[in-house]
From Swiss-Prot:
This is UDP-N-acetylglucosamine--N-acetylmuramyl-(pentapeptide) pyrophosphoryl-undecaprenol N-acetylglucosamine transferase. The gene is murG. Its EC number is 2.4.1.227. The keyword Membrane applies. UDP-N-acetyl-alpha-D-glucosamine binds at S195, Q287. It is a peripheral membrane protein. It catalyses: Mur2Ac(oyl-L-Ala-gamma-D-Glu-L-Lys-D-Ala-D-Ala)-di-trans,octa-cis-undecaprenyl diphosphate + UDP-N-acetyl-alpha-D-glucosamine = beta-D-GlcNAc-(1->4)-Mur2Ac(oyl-L-Ala-gamma-D-Glu-L-Lys-D-Ala-D-Ala)-di-trans,octa-cis-undecaprenyl diphosphate + UDP + H(+). Coiled coil: none annotated. Its main location: membrane. It comes from the Bacteria. GO terms for cellular component: plasma membrane. Disulfide bonds: none annotated.
């Protein structure tokens, strides 16, 4: 039986693509294994999916770009994780390893290279993350959402892989109930901060609720169930599944962080969006780079976090609604989206060519 290993975790963004690809391999008769951290979100997501996947937990350490004594301890964890991953490679004997990145992916990627297992890696951001910089050295091929320097010869630019499209979804009954609380004469804003919500958006909506709901209908996906409410011109919910696409359809403008997965979903849907990226003090600056790229391409408006005030938001909303046709045209003319089916075909073809 053909066998494939997946790895990636730490955030939902490092797991989502794996969860889209795994069913396709299973359908074609592959035995699927996953290497991650049993205490990580990757284990939770695999369990929730109900997919027939064998999960292997290994030790891992956080990769830091700054000096910390914790780096020493985590270095030993990574080394132990490599030995654990080597044992898994010898036991499973997979045809390939596919990595979506995140620090948990480093031990299995290195172990796969040492074992002679072909390694395929996906990078979502404009600048390659630290884990994937290591993975690139071990990779048979790396697939990139953004164009990368030609000097990186193992990289293939494939665009963003997403199952989202611009097709309107069916309207569930709950959406009709929400719409009854909204004012048809006001624009609808949707605040979304990624898989765990964004505290800055939650605080902004809470602190400015009265004024915001005078000017807009507000949807706030919070990641915090204690904030759940449905009232006049306001809907706040911790998490949504079946409602996600209908709520996106309902929104006139989406206010989002700058994570690659989310903004490319918005591009695929051709949704007007304002990007409020995480600053360099809270990240490696990848969201700022992603936002700048989207602004340069004419897909979005960028609003710095310190400018997220009532006045700053209103100016950004007015700008994007005033020039909405220009933004719509730029998004609809883009060629940066690849379907899951198309990417699966590319990956499977490369795996077949890479078999020894």
């Amino acid at each position: 039986m053909k066998k494939i290993l997946f790895t990636g975790g730490g955030t939902v963004g490092h797991v989502t693509l794996n969860l889209l690809l795994i069913p396709k391999f299973i359908k074609e008769g592959w035995q699927v294994h996953y290497i991650g951290d049993k205490n990580g979100i990757e284990y939770q997501e695999i369990q929730k999916s109900g997919l027939d996947v064998t999960f292997h937990s290994v030790a891992t350490g956080k990769l830091r770009r700054y000096f910390s004594w914790q780096n020493l301890l985590d270095g030993f964890k990574v080394i132990w994780g490599i030995f654990q991953s080597l044992s898994i490679m010898l036991k499973v004997r997979p045809q390939a390893l596919f990595s979506k990145g995140g620090f948990v992916s480093v031990p299995p990627v290195i172990a796969a290279r040492l074992s002679g297992v072909p390694v395929y890696v996906h990078e979502s951001d404009l600048s390659i993350g630290l884990a994937n910089k290591i993975a690139y050295k071990c990779a048979t091929k790396m697939y990139a959402t953004f164009e990368q320097p030609s000097s990186l010869t193992k990289i293939e630019h494939v665009g963003a892989v997403t199952k989202v499209s611009g097709t309107k979804s069916d309207l569930p009954q709950e959406l009709e109930e929400i719409r009854q609380y909204f004012d048809k004469e006001l624009p609808t804003l949707l605040f979304v901060g990624g898989s765990a919500g964004a505290k800055v958006f939650n605080d902004f909506v809470s602190q400015n609720q009265a004024t915001l709901t005078e000017r807009y209908n507000v949807i706030n996906l919070t990641g915090d169930a204690s904030l759940d409410v449905l009232s006049d011109r306001l809907f706040r919910r911790a998490y949504v599944t079946d409602l996600y696409q209908p709520l996106m359809d309902l929104a006139d403008v989406v206010v989002t962080r700058g994570g690659s997965n989310t903004i490319f979903e918005l591009l695929a849907m051709a949704k007007l969006h304002i990007i409020v990226p995480l600053g360099r003090e809270a990240s490696r600056g990848d969201q700022i780079e992603n936002a700048d790229y989207f602004v340069k391409k004419g897909y979005a408006v960028k609003l710095e976090e310190e400018q997220l005030t009532l006045e700053g938001l209103e100016a950004s909303v007015e700008q994007i609604l005033r020039d909405k046709n220009t933004y719509y045209q730029a998004m609809k003319n883009s060629h940066e989206i690849k379907s899951v089916e198309d990417f699966y075909a590319v990956l499977k073809n490369d795996i077949n060519k890479g078999k020894k």
